[in-house]
Amino acid sequence: MSTYTRPVKLLLCGLLLLTLAIAVLNTLVPLWLAQASLPTWQVGMVSSSYFTGNLVGTLFTGYLIKRIGFNRSYYLASLIFAAGCVGLGVMVGFWSWMSWRFIAGIGCAMIWVVVESALMCSGTSHNRGRLLAAYMMVYYVGTFLGQLLVSKVSGELLHVLPWVTGMILAGILPLLFTRIVNQQTEARYSTSISAMLKLRQARLGVNGCIISGIVLGSLYGLMPLYLKHQGMANASIGFWMAVLVSAGILGQWPVGRLADKFGRLLVLRVQVFVVILGSIVMLTQAAMAPALFILGAAGFTLYPVAMAWACEKVEHHQLVAMNQALLLSYTVGSLLGPSFTAMLMQNYSDNLLFLMIASVSFIYLLMLLRNAGQTPNPVAHI
């Protein structure tokens, strides 16, 4: 059977449109708030409300999928996200926008849980790496194109909201032409997120998602600041960030293919070692271009491989709950990592960005090496 079935292709098409909308709003909302003369701390609170919504949406989407299935959960998630977008045009103000961004955060998290869970339930141990690699490629391409859109179109609030809302609603259309089977409704057992987080044999995957959140959150959030402090102009910063993200896009398919062929454990070890190597090279400031490229290629592909590892350790009816646990772990890492790293950079040195990334990656590498006796690709429950 083909890895990229018709439902998978249509699901990824819808995700591309939704990711474009997410990228545009995540870039423009802080700018709109600044134009409205809101203080910096309020801009930060609005951003935090979005991520809080992500956490809330992650927690209950599994129950929703079990009750109404993948398709209806996807439709509902998209409509919630669209409502959060439309609400921004109702009233510009701190409390109003904090509420609407919270709602948008819930919708976005629901979309991610539905898409990731559907892909994992559609795959097997032999092709999940490629499925998740395709998912991440679509996500990063959508993010890149969203940034491109921001630079090419009018950034006025009332000009942007109509076409972004239309794009969100258009993201629903592909799934109207297919049905994603939810086999979890046939399961007799109920699985909780906490049970998945405590599952000993999947701990490497959970820890990998936390580390991935720390690494990517720090690179996304703090790399532009690091480059700015090196005296670079905005155009140069944009170029180097494009190198980083492009490397992440290019690395997805080959890494996913290698993980399917040679096993997740071996590939995870190599990835983490390469992240450490890239961080050390960045500390020496010897060769920024290759260092950033290998950081992007290894760091941006860590999440899907760690996710595939964890999913091989559970029964088929536990996949949605496991995906919730992994996405929750990633979100926590992406929230805590940049916050702690930013404090270190402010109080000591900007180089602590890469020292922090190398340190947490080294800890994870030790965890991976301790599991040398385990089979790299455990038998999956199909």
From Swiss-Prot:
Keywords: Cell inner membrane, Cell membrane, Membrane, Transmembrane, Transmembrane helix, Transport. Its main location: membrane. It is a multi-pass membrane protein. The chain crosses the membrane at residues 14-34, 45-65, 75-95, 102-122, 131-151, 157-177, 204-224, 235-255, 265-284, 289-311, 325-345, 349-369. InterPro entries: MFS, MFS_dom, MFS_trans_sf, MFS_YcaD, MFS_YcaD-like. SUPFAM superfamilies: MFS general substrate transporter (SSF103473). GO terms for cellular component: plasma membrane. One of its GO terms (molecular function) is transmembrane transporter activity. PROSITE patterns: MFS. It is found in: Cell inner membrane. It comes from the Bacteria. Disulfide bonds: none annotated. PANTHER family: TRANSPORTER MFS SUPERFAMILY. Belongs to the major facilitator superfamily. YcaD (TC 2.A.1.26) family. This is Uncharacterized MFS-type transporter YcaD. It comes from Salmonella arizonae (strain ATCC BAA-731 / CDC346-86 / RSK2980). The lineage of its organism: Bacteria, Pseudomonadati, Pseudomonadota, Gammaproteobacteria, Enterobacterales.
